[in-house]
Amino acid sequence: MSERTSLSRRRLLRATGLSSAAALAGCLGGGGGGSQRVPTDVGEWPPTEYNEELIVWNWYDDWASWAKGAFEKEHGVSVTTSGYSSPNQWYSKLQSGGAGIDNIAGTTNWVERSIENDFLHEIPVDLMPAWGNITDRIKEVSSYQKDGKTYGVPESLVLYPLTYNTDYFDAAPSSWDVLWSDEHRGKIVMWDNSTVSCQIAALYTGQDPIRPKDYAEIEEVLKQQKPLLKTYWGDYEQAQQLFVNEDVVAGPLTMGRTYTARFKEGAPVHYTAPKEGAMYTSDLFVIPKSAPNPIASLLFTDWASQPAVAAKLFETMGYKPAVDISDQLSERDLKFTTWSDDWNLVFQETLSDDVRSKYDEIWTAVKAA
């Protein structure tokens, strides 16, 4: 840990508190600095006793790199960040004990599994000043609570829209049927993801993407679509470059990647939610029960939910924060990040094991066709 020449008043108070608690921490076998305390032990804000280390797993890499320096500067905590490409990477760590992770940004369905398996600390959101910054849209749908207790704080809203080339189309495509049109043969793309692609097909055929009734129809239309496609994409950067290079003109791509393609690489692209609907979900900050520095993690979660900090998520990654940042954005970015009230948006609830299995079977059959 780097040496510092001065202590802020907050850190001085924290150091004083630690010295008075050292004997107790030693008796408990802890490492000091609040490692024996859990988030619900915090009785006032801000917490004055916490370790000076923090280990963060967050797949918004550019934001996490910025947050590391900013949080270290503001709170005197040494932050280690790690990215991940698939949620099962951190989930499997929690299954095996989860040692070494203090704060995770996880998707809703994996957070729900973690709650059910008692992997997460309860978070005292009523004590956190920044909790009031979280928008009602995501508070009302995100599955981060159980038995009246809160286990996650929403970080972002993730939309799975239809991205399209604005030079090719005179107006935003109004339907997912654009991905089944022979007119665009060889110019459209689909995500190599069983859940996303099957849910798009479910929406296209007028079904509930969470609880579909006609799996045969979903499989049939996906097989019909296959010869029309330029390719399936499996890597986010690959998909982004397909649009940047104008190899494709329409297909599913995340809002964040669409933003990057448009404003950082100059691609003529935008996104929309077709009339049949589009899926969206949330990523949430969670604190594992095995976290070595849970109080520092709680402090980080509140800090990250401040508008100025959350705005950096949009600025660096193009994703919509769970916090209202409208007063932090330029007119251009505000227009890009605003979702129309007319859109039919479907929250991505956790799929049942049966639906998930059926979607996997369908996708295997489609890819083999």
Sequence positions of predicted segments:
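Extracellular/periplasmic bilobal clamshell ligand-binding domains
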Residues: 331-369
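Extracytoplasmic ligand-binding site segments that recognize negatively charged/polar headgroups
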Residues: 100, 104-230, 237-244
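N-terminal secretory signal peptides and thylakoid transit peptides that target proteins
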Residues: 1-20
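Mature extracytoplasmic/periplasmic domains
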Residues: 278-279, 283, 288-346
